[in-house]
């Protein structure tokens, strides 16, 4: 679970997960200065910077993400460190050695009934090469990985798009346009292949009128990019809301009864991005616009709303989406903890009487 959090957090912040540490088990009431003091005492030889902190609900404690900024001696990084409230745990991903890489490579290919030579032959490498072993130079291992194994895996096993036809009534397995486009943007960003291959995979998901649109465009412009294809589909099949309509919808989206404020922020974000796309809000003002609307729309989170109002009134830039969610989740955790304590106290009083 901790390793998954480390990888997801790093991916969300565009940080190399092998150059990062996750420190968790930090008490909720531990402030920034106390965290920094503990880290410095436990890792005096390690150069790092703290990227962020969050409340980890499953552990009922805070977690901190650190980026390693210098030459790293992984032997100097402790797996645990003494801190406020007990022992803090440390999770990281040291670089894989050549021997470990080879072992994993052979295991993977063996499960599929392949050898490295088989893969090289299929991909057009006619010259036979010796089976890789621990003595093979790292440059050759990297070449095999980048030019043989990764392309094979990516070409055979990749996440496919859902189907879209553009028909008024979607057929079996087909999506309407807005959900399809959102899913397509997410998946296409994950594909580590050329734009030509991305366009081919995009065409795989299209049926009927939608496929006809892209075929016509491709006939007129054989070099059309995947992004241009998506833009064309949006112009043909997307909503025709004006920038004013989108902005009004954004400003009239409020927190629902029983909805956590963090969930409201996540629900609000696609609308905000659409407002930006329509040009109603400048990209430079996105964080401020988000904060103002969250404060205005937080109908059912009074205490957190007051904290956010103080954040907005303070000098300095408004928090970005990630920082805002971290702040809100920490406040939600405090409220839940206070509510649980109040419930226990009430049970105790009822039992006494």
From Swiss-Prot:
Family (UniProt): Belongs to the PNMA family.
Major localisation: nucleus
Entry-linked Pfam families: PNMA (PF14893), PNMA_N (PF20846)
Record's keyword terms, sorted: Nucleus
Listed GO biological process terms: inflammatory response to antigenic stimulus
Localization of this protein: Nucleus, Nucleolus
Highest taxon listed in the record's lineage: Eukaryota
Name of protein: Paraneoplastic antigen Ma1 homolog
InterPro entries assigned: PNMA, PNMA_C, PNMA_N
A single GO cellular-component term on record: nucleolus
Keyword Zinc-finger assigned: no
């Amino acid at each position: 679970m901790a390793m998954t959090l480390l990888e997801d957090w790093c991916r969300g912040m565009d940080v190399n997960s092998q150059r990062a540490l996750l420190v968790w088990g930090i008490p909720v009431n531990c402030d920034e200065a106390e965290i920094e003091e503990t880290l410095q005492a436990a890792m005096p030889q390690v150069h790092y910077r703290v990227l962020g902190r969050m409340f980890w609900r499953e552990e009922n404690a805070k977690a901190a993400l650190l980026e390693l900024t210098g030459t790293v001696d992984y032997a100097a990084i402790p797996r645990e460190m003494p801190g406020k409230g007990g022992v803090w745990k440390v999770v990281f991903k040291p670089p894989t050695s050549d021997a470990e890489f080879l072992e994993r490579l052979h295991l993977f290919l063996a499960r599929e009934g392949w050898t490295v030579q088989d893969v090289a032959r299929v991909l057009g490498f006619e010259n036979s090469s010796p089976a890789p072993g621990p003595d093979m130079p790292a440059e050759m291992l990297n070449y095999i990985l980048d030019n043989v194994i990764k392309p094979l895996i990516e070409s055979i096993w990749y996440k496919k798009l859902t189907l879209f036809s553009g028909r008024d009534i979607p057929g079996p397995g087909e999506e309407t346009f807005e959900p399809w486009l959102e899913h397509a943007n997410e998946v296409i960003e994950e594909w580590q292949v050329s734009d030509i291959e991305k366009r081919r995979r995009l065409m795989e998901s299209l049926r009927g009128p939608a496929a006809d649109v892209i075929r016509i465009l491709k006939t007129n412009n054989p070099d059309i990019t995947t992004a241009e294809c998506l833009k064309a589909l949006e112009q043909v099949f997307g909503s025709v809301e004006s920038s004013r309509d989108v902005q009004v919808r954004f400003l009239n989206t409020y927190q629902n009864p029983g909805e956590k404020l963090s969930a409201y922020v996540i629900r609000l974000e696609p609308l905000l991005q659409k407002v930006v796309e329509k040009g109603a809000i400048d990209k430079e003002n996105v964080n401020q616009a988000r904060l103002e609307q969250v404060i205005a729309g937080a109908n059912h989170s009074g205490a957190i709303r007051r904290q956010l109002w103080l954040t907005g009134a303070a000098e300095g830039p408004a928090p970005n989406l990630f920082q805002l969610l971290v702040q809100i989740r920490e406040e939600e955790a405090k409220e839940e903890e206070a509510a649980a304590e109040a419930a226990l106290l009430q049970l105790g009083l009822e039992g006494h009487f």
